[in-house]
Amino acid sequence: MSAKVASNKEAPLTEDSVSDLSSDGVEAEGVDQTENSGADAMIDSEPATEAGVMKQAFGFIKNHLKVGADMTKLPIPATFVQPISFLTAIQQQSAIFSHLLTSAPYIKEDDQRFLQVLKYHLTWPKMYFPKNPLNPILGEVYECQVQHTDEKTNEVIQGDITHFTAEQISHHPPISCFNFYNDKHKIKFDSKQQITPVFKGKCIRVNMDVKTCITLEREGGVTETYFNDKFTEGYLRLLRWKFEFTGKYNFVCPETGYSAVINFKDKPIIGGKWHDLQIIVSKGTEPIYDIHGTHVDILTITNLKDKTSGVFINYNTMRSEPVIEEPMEQLKENASQKVWKGVAEGFAKKDSRKAGLEKQRIEDLQRKKAKVNLAKDPNFIHKPHYFIHNPNLPADCVKPDYIFKKPVESSTPNLSKVDSSAKIENSIPVDNSIPQTTN
């Protein structure tokens, strides 16, 4: 059977072409496009474990890529696909822990407020997915809400709603924008993300160009911003079969002078531990707190002045809240749930061939739309619906360069709760307590 990355010459859609679950369906430099290079040539069954997924993924990639190839244009076998859009996966994971930010504007002490915002920032490593989420189509949008609840009574807090919006603003390269805001607590979050996996021979390196900015408006109209200057990289190494984050970056609040050096440590070949993380929080140049542990279990915080320690984050018991979405029939055609509905249904029925056919149909339609747009205007540039590019930011600015266009009025029409844990593979169990920071 021949399964090639789609070229300019369009091929008919058949059952045999389904194994080419291409993320974009265009020819890519470094991608093997020879006969029998499709997924079905080597993938016959679903791996039972994460290590099994990793081994098969590496074997498939090793046989299909040249060193240095950009993997965003690699045909992705069904075995490695998670039937949920990247926009949905990331935004839902952001949403379920957003309650951590709602208390931050009311914390009077600068250091404790910084730690609370940092605690929310450090929920991002839980966004790791063993399987690849679906690459959003251009103009795809995902929207949801969280109706916050009282931690003690578990009762809904009237008027305490956080609104979430994500949009795919570019397909090549794949760039996604994210925003959420809560008017009651005057908080907002902005992010621009471009994730690019690259095959390096003995490992897969994931370049993570992620810019985030959290904005708080405190009493008296005082505004504070919290942002990262760069981000980590991800690695899947031959024979280790675990996905690791590695690298060091800064998370800062210029208005208060507090900052954190966040260091995801590489595990040595001998000794050490997996997913090791150390964070030094400073006021100016003076270190104040040492946070250490792993980003899959427990982080402990130590006050460097009085040497007292306590739990900062317990990733196993962190409280989460459900996501609320509009019913399927009320969604627009470019909503993530509607775009990938057929793919999700195929996987739910364990019919990966039909899921693949639906995925290919969606991507073929996107390519045809792109051709039509370029035929009408050779200089065509897609204009996002919810995000506006900010040309006033300097080229080296570390903040997201797209501004969210907040709607004039926010409404909650016929929203229904979504079981986020069913959609997000590594969702954290719900618990009724939030680990408290120890001074």
Curated annotation (Swiss-Prot):
Compositionally biased intervals (Polar residues): 409-419, 429-439
Pfam family of the protein (one): Oxysterol_BP
Alphabetized PROSITE patterns for the sequence: OSBP
The organism's place on the tree of life at top rank: Eukaryota
Disordered as annotated region, ranges: 1-40, 409-439
GO (cellular component) term, any one: membrane
Coiled coil: none
InterPro entries the record matches: OSBP_sf, Oxysterol-bd, Oxysterol-bd_CS
GO molecular function: sterol binding
Protein family (similarity comment): Belongs to the OSBP family.
PANTHER family: OXYSTEROL-BINDING PROTEIN 6, OXYSTEROL-BINDING PROTEIN-RELATED
Protein name: Oxysterol-binding protein 6
